[in-house]
């Protein structure tokens, strides 16, 4: 009888936000077409490490399981990505799972992404409305603009681009590429453009565009293929124009 194939994991764990991280190894039976989340569920069902010791179930975030929500981001074999689309058959073993280091660890592979959401609040990444009553159809966007704006709207706030960016870290206030790309998205909307100057001025503040080192890691790592560096370049132009308006004034009422 042939020996059963197994999958070996080395998982970086942390019991609390303030405790020291440590590595723990697990082994589960191999099944074809497994993804990392399925394997983590298997470990959770029977949390026994390779030493045969009963341990606590591994904690991580997940939701949609189809790369839409962005919740299951983690570092897999050194690369930040979604664990729901990371197929075991395509990964080198042992598979190393770590939490993203850009965000504070809550427990094990679960992180607190508040930093990113606070940046989205700072740049007003939404379109204000007066109420929930029907106002009828809004202004239409030119088709060419709609096409590139749609690409920006694919952002699922997964945090992978922030994890890949060398300028986003605990010593920096840099907001990172995802919130900046959303500024370009909402400024392109005919109604969202009403708050265009406020968003641009937020980017001109501390932690904004000036802190970008143009390493271009973000566009390489984005699971949705969003043209983040294109947005950053466009926003550099927009913020320069905004700086001139602030200095010389504008003839627009």
From Swiss-Prot:
EC number assigned by the record: 1.3.5.1
Classification via PANTHER family: SUCCINATE DEHYDROGENASE [UBIQUINONE] IRON-SULFUR SUBUNIT, MITOCHONDRIAL, SUCCINATE DEHYDROGENASE IRON-SULFUR PROTEIN
Catalytic activity from the UniProt record: a quinone + succinate = fumarate + a quinol
UniProt protein name: Succinate dehydrogenase iron-sulfur subunit
Residues that hold [3Fe-4S] cluster according to the record: 165, 212, 218
Required co-factors: [2Fe-2S] cluster; [3Fe-4S] cluster; [4Fe-4S] cluster
Pathway terms, separated by semicolons: Carbohydrate metabolism; tricarboxylic acid cycle; fumarate from succinate (bacterial route): step 1/1
Principal EC category: oxidoreductase
Positions of the 4Fe-4S ferredoxin-type domain: 146-174
Record's subunit section: In B.subtilis succinate dehydrogenase forms part of an enzyme complex containing three subunits: a flavoprotein, an iron-sulfur protein and cytochrome b-558.
Keyword presence, Transferase: no
Gene it is expressed from: sdhB
InterPro entries from the UniProt entry: 2Fe-2S_ferredoxin-like_sf, 4Fe4S_Fe-S-bd, 4Fe4S_Fe_S_CS, Beta-grasp_dom_sf, Helical_ferredxn, SDH/FRD_Iron-Sulfur, Succ_DH/fum_Rdtase_Fe-S, Succ_DH/fum_Rdtase_N
Alphabetic keyword roster: 2Fe-2S, 3Fe-4S, 4Fe-4S, Electron transport, Iron, Iron-sulfur, Metal-binding, Oxidoreductase, Transport, Tricarboxylic acid cycle
């Amino acid at each position: 009888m042939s020996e059963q194939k197994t999958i070996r994991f080395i998982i970086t764990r942390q019991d609390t936000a303030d405790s020291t991280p440590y590595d723990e190894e697990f082994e589960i039976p191999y099944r074809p077409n497994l993804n990392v989340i399925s394997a983590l569920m298997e470990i959770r069902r029977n949390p026994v490490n390779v030493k045969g010791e009963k341990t606590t179930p591994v904690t991580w975030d997940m939701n949609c399981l189809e790369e839409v929500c962005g919740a299951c981001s983690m570092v897999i074999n050194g690369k930040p990505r979604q664990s729901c689309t990371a197929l075991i058959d395509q990964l080198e073993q042992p598979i190393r799972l770590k939490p993203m280091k850009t965000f504070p660890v809550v427990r094990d592979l679960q992180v607190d992404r508040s930093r990113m959401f606070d940046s989205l609040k700072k740049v007003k990444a939404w379109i204000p409305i007066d109420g929930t009553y029907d106002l009828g159809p809004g202004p239409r966007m030119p088709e060419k603009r709609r096409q590139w704006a749609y690409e920006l709207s694919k952002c699922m706030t997964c945090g992978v681009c922030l994890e890949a960016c060398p300028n986003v870290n605990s010593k920096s206030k840099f907001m990172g590429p995802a919130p900046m790309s959303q500024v370009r998205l909402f400024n392109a909307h005919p109604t969202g453009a009403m708050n265009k100057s406020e968003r641009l001025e937020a980017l001109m503040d501390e932690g904004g565009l000036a802190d970008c080192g143009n390493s271009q890691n973000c566009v390489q790592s984005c699971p949705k293929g969003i043209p983040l560096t294109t947005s950053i370049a466009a926003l550099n132009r927009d913020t320069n124009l905004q700086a001139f308006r602030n200095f010389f004034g504008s003839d627009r009422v």
